[in-house]
Curated annotation (Swiss-Prot):
Gene for this chain: fmt
Record protein name field: Methionyl-tRNA formyltransferase
GO function terms (MF aspect): methionyl-tRNA formyltransferase activity
Catalyses which reaction(s): L-methionyl-tRNA(fMet) + (6R)-10-formyltetrahydrofolate = N-formyl-L-methionyl-tRNA(fMet) + (6S)-5,6,7,8-tetrahydrofolate + H(+)
Keywords per UniProt: Protein biosynthesis, Transferase
InterPro entries, sorted: Fmt, Formyl_trans_C, Formyl_transf_N, Formyl_transf_N_sf, Formyl_transferase-like_C_sf, Met-tRNA-FMT_C, Met-tRNA-FMT_N
Cellular component annotations (GO), alphabetically ordered: cytosol
Biological role stated in the UniProt entry: Attaches a formyl group to the free amino group of methionyl-tRNA(fMet). The formyl group appears to play a dual role in the initiator identity of N-formylmethionyl-tRNA by promoting its recognition by IF2 and preventing the misappropriation of this tRNA by the elongation apparatus.
HAMAP family, A to Z: Formyl_trans
EC number(s) on file: 2.1.2.9
């Protein structure tokens, strides 16, 4: 099958790599976001998908907008049988969706119709879901509403950060995506409309939304921090200092909401239920470090609170 792959960030890499190595499919081009300025050095950086394509000599298309007529013309010239998509990051107009013979097959990291949107992994952890997964579905104009070809499930571990879980979903979802393309080519697979029940949404997590709310129960605080780790990163104010915080451990200790207790094994902060132990913290301009060591060095006043 002639394939044009669309994707941008690191979680899309396992799927592209698997298709490149597949004996059944030929990746004739890759579509990714344009090179962007990133990092402290403000260097122009190629996307992970663009870099992988370059390694294998695969042509790379980087339209600023997928509605660009030149992009549609180039895509049509390639005559793709199918266009798999993993976290591409651009909306595709209908004339572009109509070009591949089998359409665009999107790998979405949730069990649709649950958690449609930009942050399904973060939403599943934050909500306390025990199981999530990935869905391969036919892309259409609506947001993650297309009929589903297949799913795979993944149990959410008690210590999973969004980065941990996304890594497993990206690897296991790649196998699902390849099997769906195999089934489409063989005429052995059909898409099933999504249920109207169980629909939920997962909008992009903003930096403001990543702030820790210590007035919530300890388990909720724990899930929230893991859900926004590594990006955009959980943060809080300690006094007048804004710091990023790493995952926490729920304890049986009792402290007032936002109250801080510095101990040998870390920094304890009170929530609406019990205290949580914070192992690592990242002050402004610094690397991640031991929260206890930082607090002892900072010599926090007794009345200082996390908020």
């Amino acid at each position: 099958m002639r394939v044009v792959f669309a994707g941008t960030p690191e979680p899309a890499v396992p799927s592209l790599r698997r298709l490149i190595e597949s004996a059944n499919h030929e990746v004739v081009a890759v579509v990714t976001r344009p090179d962007a300025v990133a990092g402290r050095g403000r260097k122009v950086t190629r996307s992970p998908i663009g870099l992988l394509a370059d390694e294998h000599g695969i042509p790379v298309l980087t339209p600023v907008k997928a509605s660009d007529p030149d992009f549609a013309a180039e895509l049509a010239r390639l005559e793709p049988d199918c266009a798999p998509v993993v976290a591409y990051g651009n909306l595709l107009p209908q004339n572009v969706l109509d070009i591949p013979k089998y359409g665009w097959v999107n790998l979405h990291f949730s069990l649709l119709p649950a958690w449609r949107g930009a942050a399904p992994v973060q939403a599943a952890i934050s909500a306390g879901d025990e199981v999530t997964g990935a869905s391969a579905f036919r892309l259409e104009a609506g947001m993650d509403t297309g009929p589903v070809y297949g799913v795979m499930t993944e149990r959410i571990r008690d210590t999973d950060t969004a980065g941990d879980l996304l890594g497993r979903l990206a690897e296991n979802g790649a196998a699902l995506l390849e099997s769906v393309l195999d089934g489409l080519e063989a005429g052995e697979i059909n898409a099933v409309p999504q249920s109207a029940d169980g629909v939920s949404y997962a909008p992009k997590v903003t930096v403001d939304a990543a702030r820790v709310r210590w007035e919530l129960p300890a388990r909720t605080v724990d899930r929230h921090i893991r859900a926004v780790t590594p990006a955009p990163g959980a943060w809080t104010m300690i006094g007048d200092l804004r710091v990023k915080v790493g995952p926490v451990t729920v304890t049986d200790e009792t402290l007032a909401v936002g109250e801080i207790s510095v101990r040998k094994d870390g920094l304890y902060i009170g929530t609406a239920t019990t205290a949580v132990r914070l192992g690592q913290i990242q002050p402004p301009g610094k690397k991640l470090m031991s929260a206890g060591d930082w607090a002892r060095g900072a010599r926090l006043d007794a009345e200082v609170r996390a908020q």
